[in-house]
Amino acid sequence: MSFLKKSLFLVLFLGLVSFSICEEEKRETEEEENEDEMNEESEEKRESPERPPGFTPFRVD
C-alpha cells in the first residue's frame, strides 16, 4: 500500500512539473508573438508618417 501511495505521489508530482513547464513555454511564446505584433505596428507607423488627406509630397505641374 505504501508503495502505491509513493508511486501515485511521484506520478502526480511529475505531471504537475511537466504541466507547469508547458504553461511557462506557452506564456513565453505568447509574449514573443505580442512583441512581434508591436514591432510590426511601430514599423508601419515609421514607414508611413501621418499626413493630412490629399497631401502629396511631390508637386506635379
From Swiss-Prot:
Cleavable signal peptide: 1-22
Organism: Agalychnis spurrelli
The protein's role, per its UniProt record: Induces relaxation of rat smooth muscle from tail artery and contraction of that from ileum, urinary bladder and uterus. Binds to both bradykinin receptor B1 (BDKRB1) and B2 (BDKRB2).
Biased composition (Acidic residues): 30-42
Cellular-component GO terms for this entry: extracellular region
SS bond list: none
GO annotation terms (biological process): vasodilation
This protein's UniProt keywords: Cleavage on pair of basic residues, G-protein coupled receptor impairing toxin, Secreted, Signal, Toxin, Vasoactive, Vasodilator
One GO MF term: toxin activity
Family in the record: Belongs to the frog skin active peptide (FSAP) family. Bradykinin-related peptide subfamily.
Region span, Disordered: 24-61
Lineage: Eukaryota, Metazoa, Chordata, Craniata, Vertebrata
Keyword Signal in record: yes
Propeptide part(s) removed at maturation, as residue ranges: 23-50
Tissue expression summary: Expressed by the skin glands.
Entry-linked InterPro entries: Frog_antimicrobial_propeptide (IPR004275)
UniProt-annotated location(s): Secreted
Protein name: [Thr6, Val10, Asp11]-phyllokinin
Pfam families given in the database record: FSAP_sig_propep (PF03032)
Predominant place of localization: secreted
